[in-house]
Amino acid sequence: MADYWKDVLPVDPYVVKSRSMLQDIDRQIITQLYQPLIGPVAFSLYMTLWGELEQNRLWGGESTHRQLMGMTQSNLKTIHQEQGKLEGIGLLKVYMKESERQERLFIYELLPPLRPNEFFEDGMLNVFLYNRVGKTKYQQLKQFFTHPAISEDAKDITRPFNHAFESLQPSEWKLTSDMEETVRLAEGSEYTSVGQSPSYTITEDVFDFDLFLAGLSETMIPRKAMTQQVRDTIKKLSYLYGIDPLQMQNVVMSAIDERDVITTEALRKAASDWYQIERNGQLPDLVEKTQPVHLREGEQPAEEDSLDGKLIALLEAISPKKLLQDIADGTEPSKADLKIIEEIMFEQKLEPGVTNVLIYYVMLKTDMKLSKNYIQKIASHWARKKVKTVREAMKLAIEENRQYLEWAEGKTKSSKRNQKVIREEKLPDWMTEKETASDSESGQQKLHPQDLEEQKKKMMEEMQKLKKYSAY
């Protein structure tokens, strides 16, 4: 169902529904806490959908995607891309209802944001926000959503229900058969709710619970302590901090209390302490993640003898931040470059190894500079292609090199037909042989031999830098 948008037509209808009554506090939370994470376009899409509910409470009227395209001034691909951010962060659910006549109706259910206390104690979103807006703005936002608590020395003297209504007669509590039918909720209906905040989801393949539990006896961690909330928190913390199942055993054991209870707050603190000990106090960051083990090629001796194999192993083993540092002779990457990479990793959900191939390719094409628009365009293209491994990314870069060149040069196909273009480009050596063969077959102009040798020399120099500064 992830590719349903490819078949969506502008005339296809949709309706907007809200999980609960959205209020002004929800608007403030989304504007100030979520917008820095999802970006202005996704934020605008949420507000546009919300606007259809203003006069209709929890359900809006039927509209078409053409009308939505007109309201947002976006095409269906862009709407789908921004919609994905809302889905991933827990602000939107999408349903498709198909009739017997093959007519489809899309239902967009708006979900309220996390409450401020839930957001700032989440362990993932709050860290992501901190890295997006910086320490000063983060503190300002946190201050905005906090207020003084009731003093601890104040005594609660609230009267209970049974004291306030002690004079009620037994007849007033009697439930008759006629009343039972009246109070029962009709099938297919749900009560109006306010402020329910379902959390975003992390897929099950992020963490191996079987391996985690295999090393823990019932005495050490009672299974009753492993509630669904605890499991969800473990998945989030594993993804955020890069904690594997065996390491997580120690984290959980340090979080359980004397009553055999594990709280989410204790888990977050234990995971944070573990991470800061491992990383000398540094906060987690998407750009410091490496390619997941299940998406690596593993040991392949035959491939290791080739440059392709060595490069794949390298790009799988290091983080995007480390790659940028290695390319710059060990110099710390600029905050601007890191922000660009972090944005594409989060928004396009690219794996770290795939991101490395993208960095490697783009920097060679743009004289060792990260062009934001160029890298974002290729990243969104790879995300739609569902590229997950380093080899897949390299293969796609080879196959679609000319298309990327057109994007970089800003030229249309019509202009390319009207003039002869001599391309003087930087080609990674893992692309050179295949690109040359392709050029020969298609009759298109190739790189001059002198330029090609110069670029191969530069590429080998860059590879030596990577080998010097990277251990894999």
UniProtKB/Swiss-Prot annotation:
Disruption phenotype: Essential, it cannot be deleted; in depletion experiments DNA replication slows as soon as the protein is degraded and replication stops by 1 hour. Keywords: Cell membrane, Cytoplasm, DNA replication, DNA-binding, Membrane, Primosome. In early growth phase only full-length protein is detected, during late growth and stationary phase full-length and C-terminally truncated proteins are seen (at protein level). Truncated protein is only seen in cytoplasmic fractions. Residues 421-437, 448-465 have a biased composition (Basic and acidic residues). One of its GO terms (molecular function) is ATP binding. The keyword Cell membrane applies. Changing residue 85 to E: In strain dnaB134; temperature-sensitive for growth. Loss of association of DnaC with oriC at 52 degrees Celsius. The keyword Cell membrane applies. It is found in: Cytoplasm; Cell membrane. GO terms for cellular component: cytoplasm; primosome complex. The dna-1 (dnaBI) and dnaB-19 (dnaBII) mutants show different characteristics for replication and membrane binding of plasmid pUB110. DnaBI is essential for both chromosome and pUB110 replication, whereas dnaBII is necessary only for chromosome replication. Belongs to the DnaB/DnaD family. Helps DnaI load the DnaC replicative helicase onto single-stranded (ss)DNA. During DNA replication from the origin of replication (oriC) in the DNA replisome, DnaD is required after DnaA, before DnaB and before subsequent helicase DnaC loading. Component of the replication restart primosome, which reloads the replicative helicase on sites other than oriC. DnaB, DnaD and DnaI may also be required for a PriA-independent pathway of replication fork restart. DnaB and DnaD work together to allow DnaB access to ssDNA. This is Replicative helicase loading/DNA remodeling protein DnaB. The gene is dnaB.
